[in-house]
């Protein structure tokens, strides 16, 4: 197994230009593909997840051209993919798999969607159930409720109301919202359970509006996609920096004194994960913001222990689980059940690896409590479970004054292929 050995860190200072947001990148690619007109996409994230979406769109007959290092030109299909038969390998990219499932269910073709073994363990049944309510023909090729899937042509009767759960993954609602304009019918979506990760739905709604579709919502329980609401290209779309990726560098600024500035997200960001900066501020970190940047510094450690609900920022919350090693008492992360159905079971994985470092960790179905210890265990090999965020989070353990070995560091290619190079430039 490949690994990277990280030296102990004492200081962090500098500025980081963030890679593009994964959530915005893959949503924008699909919307541009479904739209009328041609779209220039600037600052797209270069990663495994976006590569899988680009490959899928190409297989579906979308004309796309790379025009710069992170820039693309897409010719929209007007809501109908040219190729009516395709076999799509989507890796472990939930931001590609879920939205494409919905879009292809309305596309009148025969499509097989599959991925890596972990993708076949990630639930999709709630989305499939919702799509079947309007007539979609979707078959499970393995275990009921999970990928891989076979989609066949079907008569879609989208008028009326679709019921869907919101407490497993917000990507199911995102997928429905993005695909329903393809039907041309007014459709209502009703949530039958609490919606998690609401900020990710905000991203979806804002991007849909940018492409000309205004979804009406009644609180977070009911959404209406208007009739005759096809997508129209806005011309050029700029992708924000990834706010989840910002969390590691803001935390480094907190643990290493700082200041560390992230560029590409700021006070005007549409991403909910910028709230990570507020969570840091609440435990004693000095945060300053501009329209397109955030900066973190801290005069001294330890930081304040916390007990906080992270339902709205589950990805960035992982970073705080490692930051908890440097707090002045037990810290508790709650309402994080969605961690269990991500790239790995993140509650179990985080608990296992924090214990290796010496922390006292308790876990429940939807919570994690971390009690720090005076001295971390040195030269601990951290397993990453093919999960990019596990690898990036545990780089912060080096601020405990110990070397840390990260196994399979290349898993960061999912969202941030150059992460460890950039991290090494701001820490010392």
From Swiss-Prot:
Annotated residues for binding of phosphoenolpyruvate: 22, 94, 122, 171, 346, 389, 414
Disulphide linkage map: none
UniProt keyword list: Amino-acid biosynthesis, Aromatic amino acid biosynthesis, Cytoplasm, Transferase
Record's subcellular location: Cytoplasm
Pathway(s) the chain acts in: Metabolic intermediate biosynthesis; chorismate biosynthesis; chorismate from D-erythrose 4-phosphate and phosphoenolpyruvate: step 6/7
Transmembrane region(s): none
Keyword Ribosomal protein annotated: no
GO molecular function: 3-phosphoshikimate 1-carboxyvinyltransferase activity
Sites where the protein binds 3-phosphoshikimate: 22-23, 27, 169-171, 197, 315, 342
InterPro entries, sorted: Enolpyruvate_Tfrase_dom (IPR001986), Enolpyruvate_Tfrase_sf (IPR036968), EPSP_synthase (IPR006264), EPSP_synthase_CS (IPR023193), RNA3'P_cycl/enolpyr_Trfase_a/b (IPR013792)
Stored HAMAP family: EPSP_synth
NCBIfam families found in the cross-reference section: aroA (TIGR01356)
Task performed by this protein: Catalyzes the transfer of the enolpyruvyl moiety of phosphoenolpyruvate (PEP) to the 5-hydroxyl of shikimate-3-phosphate (S3P) to produce enolpyruvyl shikimate-3-phosphate and inorganic phosphate.
Family: Belongs to the EPSP synthase family.
Protein name: 3-phosphoshikimate 1-carboxyvinyltransferase
Protein species of origin: Cellvibrio japonicus (strain Ueda107) (Pseudomonas fluorescens subsp. cellulosa)
Organism placement in taxonomy: Bacteria, Pseudomonadati, Pseudomonadota, Gammaproteobacteria, Cellvibrionales
Encoding gene per record: aroA
């Amino acid at each position: 197994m490949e690994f990277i050995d990280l030296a102990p860190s004492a200081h962090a200072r500098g500025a980081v230009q963030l890679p593009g947001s994964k959530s915005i990148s893959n949503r924008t690619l699909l919307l541009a593909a479904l739209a009328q007109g041609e779209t220039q996409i600037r600052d797209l994230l270069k990663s495994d997840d976006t590569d899988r979406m680009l490959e899928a769109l190409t297989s579906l007959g979308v004309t796309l051209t790379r025009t710069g290092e992170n820039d693309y030109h897409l010719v929209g299909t007007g809501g109908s993919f040219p190729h009516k038969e395709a076999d799509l390998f989507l890796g472990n990219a939930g931001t590609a798999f879920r939205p494409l499932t919905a879009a292809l269910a309305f596309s009148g073709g025969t499509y097989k969607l599959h991925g890596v073994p972990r993708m076949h363990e990630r639930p999709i049944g709630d989305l499939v159930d919702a799509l079947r309510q309007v007539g979609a023909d979707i078959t499970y090729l393995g275990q009921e409720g999970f990928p891989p899937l076979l989609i066949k042509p079907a008569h879609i009767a989208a008028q009326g109301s679709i019921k869907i759960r919101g407490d497993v993954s917000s990507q199911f609602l995102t997928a429905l919202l993005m695909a329903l304009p393809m039907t041309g019918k007014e459709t209502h979506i009703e949530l039958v359970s609490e919606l998690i990760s609401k900020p990710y739905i905000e991203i979806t709604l804002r991007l849909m509006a940018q492409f000309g579709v205004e979804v009406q919502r009644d609180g977070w329980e009911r959404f209406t996609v208007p009739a005759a609401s096809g997508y129209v290209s806005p011309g050029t779309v700029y992708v924000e920096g990834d706010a989840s990726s910002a969390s590691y560098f803001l935390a480094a600024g907190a643990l290493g004194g700082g200041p560390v500035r992230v560029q590409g997200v700021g006070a005007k960001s549409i991403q909910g994960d910028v709230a990570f900066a507020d969570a840091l501020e609440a435990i004693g970190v000095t945060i300053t913001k501009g329209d397109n940047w955030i900066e973190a510094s801290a005069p001294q450690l330890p930081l304040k222990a916390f007990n906080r609900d992270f339902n709205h920022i589950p990805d960035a919350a992982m970073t705080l689980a490692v930051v908890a090693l440097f707090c002045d008492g037990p810290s508790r992360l709650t309402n994080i059940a969605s961690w269990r159905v991500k790239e790995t079971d993140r509650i179990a994985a985080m608990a296992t690896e924090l214990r290796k470092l010496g922390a006292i960790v308790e876990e429940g179905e939807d919570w994690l409590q971390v009690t720090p210890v005076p001295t971390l265990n040195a030269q601990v090999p951290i397993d990453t479970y093919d999960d990019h965020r596990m690898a990036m989070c545990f780089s912060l353990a080096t601020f405990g004054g110990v070397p840390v070995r990260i196994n399979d560091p290349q898993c960061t290619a999912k969202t941030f292929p150059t992460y460890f190079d950039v991290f090494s430039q701001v820490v010392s």
